[in-house]
Amino acid sequence: MEKLSTAASLFCVVVAATALAMAVVGGEAAVVEQTFMVHEMNVTHLCNTTKIYVVNGRFPGPTVDVTEGDTVVVHVINRLPHGLTIHWHGVRQMRSCWADGAGYVTECPIHPGGEKTYRFNVTGQVGTLWWHAHVTCLRATINGAFIIRPRNGKYPFLTPAKDVPIIIGEWWELDLIELDRRMLDGNFDDNPLSATINGKLGDLSNCSSTVEESFVLDVKRGESYLLRVINTALFSEYYFKVAGHTFTVVGADGNYLTPYKTDMVTVAPGEAIDVLMFTDAPPAYYHMVALANQPPPPDLQIPQLTSRGLIRYAGAAMDSNNLPMPMPVMPDQHNTMPSYYFRRNLTGLALPEQQQRHRVPAHVDERLLITLGLGSICRGGNTTTCKRGRSPETVVVATMNNVSFHHTNATALLEHYYDGRPEGVYTEDFPVRPPRPFNYTDRELIPAGPLEAALEPTAKAMRLRRFRYNASVEIVFQSTTLLQSDSNPMHLHGYDVFVLAQGLGNFDPKRDVEKFNYHNPQLRNTVQVPRGGWAAVRFLADNPGMWYLHCHFEFHIIMGMATAFIVEDGPTPETSLPPPPPEFKRCGTNGLSQP
């Protein structure tokens, strides 16, 4: 965790959030209450002092630690000069869409100097999620773990001696508000200076003679540790390894997985992976490493991002005879295949009491094929007669089925839907397939040229999709090579989806449906669609409201790789979205929440 100045430390003592659990008697559900004071703080790294945005003086921020069935109450006090929302990433928010915290989708940001209370229940989920700011690029430093423990205190695996959040992130020297402005203007030349592990850059980063501090995890030999690995980064998927040790993957995104042994974890932005690590190595110091991957050229390249920490065994002294073991052998940063194979080996684990929730819908009411890539819009509003192929006459945007989401900064979509006044704000005609089929993964589409120029034209619009309550929805996400060949971590708010299958190349509905896993698929809120490949998911639309769907690469969100799903009310009050709670503050005329 980032070191604080004396003043900041004193500030934390005065206003630090306290978890207040009430009525925890005999395993009954509790109310867990915390306060988040969001403010600016100066931090020095790599010989430069940078202004960052934090919660309660901490980077990463405080952990929200609850038990399944609890009610969570978080009071957010915004001391920033900018608007702010907090999103509870992966929390189902059953009938509490108003508390989802998606800026301009479910609420307008909390105005500077303002406050808001988020109140919601956590039911049917156990494991690791996280929380983060959901406006501009603030989630780079405003984030933290969200842990849900089993109500009966028992895990379907060996109870760990200790559990530890491992929050992988990035260190940005550029002010995050300015970073957002630059990307909105089409400038994507800025990059983070380093990866971080729990806010520490690690000893591979240095300036002059100053070596950056590393995150150190103290362990005892012969015990098991539950590492809750979370990727909060804006730009990159990460490989994570510990020298001399292996992992057993036991959960992801607040759901159990069939135990899977591996020596490396792959975690994309938005994902949370639970792994057991057994400390069965000789007592010593062992490096842990987080390495970002990226597509090879001709895709645009960013500097290699790596952070290194330490596992320190009790009784192991650091001296010339007991130096840390060598770095674990990592994949090449341009090799993205380990990510694909890691995910293909994961399957879901349903406990007896979870069988109903883990039943894959047998029939499909709505089918969507969503292509993910880049495109272009003409400058000046002319959508048909400009030169394509990275021409100065166009602006490059991110697209889903050749629609680039037009983000509003003046109102919240949920309010317009609930009030029955969508006119002039959004339409409900998001396409269920791309405008025309093509070879989605043709490598010749990456450089600008005649092949991709004909596929570039894109609509900049706020086009949503509506589903009736309890409809069974199947989506095939297809990554493309239009101007780039990135993977795409797709996050759906308000839902866990069954990951039926993933594959490379173009999805073939006749051939690839045979690969679907209906028996024990993973349940995930964030699905990594492989580079040059596809992922098929299915879910039951049983949570009414307005739910944001977007790629969790920040530059893809800003460029428009997003939409929202409207799920209609069911036939009863218990299956309908209730009115906004008393603490909910509607949008004002300035695009921020009312005072």
UniProtKB/Swiss-Prot annotation:
EC number(s) reported in the record: 1.10.3.2
Name assigned to this protein: Laccase-18
Record's GO cellular component terms: apoplast
Function: Lignin degradation and detoxification of lignin-derived products.
Superkingdom of origin organism: Eukaryota
Organism: Oryza sativa subsp. japonica
Compartment list: Secreted, Extracellular space, Apoplast
Signal peptide, first to last residue: 1-29
Positions of Cu cation 4 binding: N488, C551, H556, M561
Keywords, sorted A to Z: Apoplast, Copper, Glycoprotein, Lignin degradation, Metal-binding, Oxidoreductase, Repeat, Secreted, Signal
Binding site for Cu cation 1: H87, H491
Binding positions (Cu cation 2): H89, H132, H552
Record GO terms (molecular function): copper ion binding; hydroquinone:oxygen oxidoreductase activity; oxidoreductase activity
Residue ranges constituting the Plastocyanin-like domain according to the UniProt record: 37-153, 162-316, 429-571
Enzyme class: oxidoreductase
Cofactor remark from the record: Binds 4 Cu cations per monomer.
Primary location: secreted
UniProt GO BP: lignin catabolic process
Residues linked to a glycan: N42, N48, N121, N206, N345, N382, N402, N409, N439, N470
SUPFAM superfamilies reported for this sequence: Cupredoxins (SSF49503)
Gene that produces this protein: LAC18
Cofactor dependence: Cu cation
Catalysed reaction, written as an equation: 4 hydroquinone + O2 = 4 benzosemiquinone + 2 H2O
Binding-site positions, Cu cation 3: H134, H493, H550
Region Disordered, residue ranges: 570-595
